[in-house]
Structure formats: C-alpha cells, structure tokens
Amino acid sequence: MTFDASGRLPEAFLTPGGSSFMDFLAGHAPDLLPGRRSLGTGDLSKDVPHGTTIVAATFDGGVVMAGDRRATMGNIIAQRDIEKVFPADEYSCVGIAGSAGLAIEMVRLFQVELEHYEKLEGTTLSLDGKANRLSALIRGNLAMAMQGLAVVPLFAGYDHDISGGRIFSYDPTGGRYEEQAFHSVGSGSLFARGSLKKLYRESMSAAECVTATIQALYDAADDDSATGGPDMARRIFPVIGVVTADGYQRMPEAEVGEIVDSVVGARLQRPDGPAAPLS
C-alpha cells in the first residue's frame, strides 16, 4: 500500500473498519500475514533457527517470565544472545519458542494488534481478550506449523480484575489453555517444569520468583542441549520480564547478573540445585 498520485493515503486507510489490525491486513494486504504465504513441500524445521525454553510463574501481585538466550539450528548453536521475552503491551508479556523468525514477526504483529485496538476503542483489551487475539495469530500459522515451522508462545500478564498474574499456553493449532501458578514451553520445558514443581511456593515474593525461574532454566540447560544456561564468560544471562499493577518491566541486566552469580555459586557446591523439603 502506497500513497496515491496526489500524496494522499489509499482508500483502505480512510474506510471505516473494525478494531482488529489483523482483519485490516486480511482485507487489504493479506500477503503480509505470515500464514498466507506459500511454502514448498517438506520439513523445514532443521533449516531455520529455533528458540528453546521459556518459563513463567506467578507471585502475589504479578507474574515473572524468563527466557534463555540460545537459538539452535539442528545441532548447531545459531545464536547465543537471542531475546525471547517481549512486552505485549503495558500489562502483559509474551515469550517465544519454536521457529525464531516467524515467532518474532508474530510478536510484532501481536503488539501492533493490541496497540491498534487501544487507539480505536480508547481502552485496552481484557487479558482474556489479548490471549484470544494471540490464539488467532497462532491459528493463522497452522500451514507453516504442519511443515515444521511451528510457533508456540507463552503469554502472561497482570489481570486487574483479580489483582494478580495469569499465564496462558498454546498449542500449534491456536488452542489456548490457562495455566495455574507456573508453566514452561520449548525443548527444555519438561525439565524446567520439573524444577519449578519442587521450587515454587504460592507465598513467594517477586525476587524469589525470579530466582526460581532462573533455577528452572539452569536445570533445563543441564539436561537439554538446545537450552542455553547462563554464559558466565560472555556475561549473557536470561531475559527476565516482571508484570505487576505498575506494568511490565524488564529486569536490568546487572540485577539479573547478581542473581545468576548467586545461583551459579551455589551450584558449585550442589550441582543439582537446591533440595526441596520432604514435608
């Protein structure tokens, strides 16, 4: 879509429509939607970088999301410092696993979708509404998912109705599922969830929740080669997002580094991590 000969916006921009940016693209530029692009045949999953492990956990007053920094392409480390946790809007965040390029593009479209709705309606979507919009985006990528290019995000945010955090997971068909307390997606998710089962407490503070998610990513990296643990030589640490009633905040690198140093120092004494009490 370009300006016409007189320098005016095309008619598409001047025609009244709904509050969905995705519907606008579908009607006027469907080729810009990821799911509308045609691909060849065959499994392409080993030919593109993949993001790996994302974890999220709620605490009293909000939710924490953490993502490792490794992207893999088959048995190759494609990138050591990729970022996989992003703000969706002021009160929510999204973490990506699966085909990295498609996932990042989907996150950008999701961010625009939420901003577009807010500008037209003068209010934000409810957290359930945001989760449903992301579900529709994932469903639109089903054709690519069938060829190995799946995008499986994790969505979390602060819900003002309950004054607390909520977590939503998805399957490649766009199915949406609300998770309780904590969840993880990606290749190391089984190990991360197992770790959080032992470490999670409903009474945890935000700082304790951050430490638990870093411990979970460490455990995932310990058993899953596609998940990157803290890179102490390069000082590359997980991306941590915290969402509370004050909005989304990315934890500063220096603060994450201090927690990582503490976790790694303790692992030198106990490599398998902290022991959970038996009662």
Swiss-Prot record:
Keywords attached to this entry: Autocatalytic cleavage, Cytoplasm, Hydrolase, Protease, Proteasome, Threonine protease, Zymogen
One cellular-component annotation, GO: proteasome core complex, beta-subunit complex
Described purpose of this protein according to its UniProt entry: Component of the proteasome core, a large protease complex with broad specificity involved in protein degradation.
Principal place of residence: cytoplasm
Name of the protein: Proteasome subunit beta
Catalytic residues, chain numbering: 52
UniProt entry tagged with the keyword Protease: yes
GO biological process, one term: proteasomal protein catabolic process
Subunit composition and interactions: The 20S proteasome core is composed of 14 alpha and 14 beta subunits that assemble into four stacked heptameric rings, resulting in a barrel-shaped structure. The two inner rings, each composed of seven catalytic beta subunits, are sandwiched by two outer rings, each composed of seven alpha subunits. The catalytic chamber with the active sites is on the inside of the barrel. Has a gated structure, the ends of the cylinder being occluded by the N-termini of the alpha-subunits. Is capped by the proteasome-associated ATPase, ARC.
Family to which the UniProt record says this protein belongs: Belongs to the peptidase T1B family.
Stored SUPFAM superfamilies: N-terminal nucleophile aminohydrolases (Ntn hydrolases)
Recorded catalytic activity of this chain's protein: Cleavage of peptide bonds with very broad specificity
Subcellular location(s) per record: Cytoplasm
Molecular function (Gene Ontology), one example: threonine-type endopeptidase activity
Pathway annotation from the record: Protein degradation; proteasomal Pup-dependent pathway
Lyase recorded as keyword: no
Biological source species: Kribbella flavida (strain DSM 17836 / JCM 10339 / NBRC 14399)
EC number from the UniProt entry: 3.4.25.1
Activity regulation comment: The formation of the proteasomal ATPase ARC-20S proteasome complex, likely via the docking of the C-termini of ARC into the intersubunit pockets in the alpha-rings, may trigger opening of the gate for substrate entry. Interconversion between the open-gate and close-gate conformations leads to a dynamic regulation of the 20S proteasome proteolysis activity.
Propeptide: 1-51
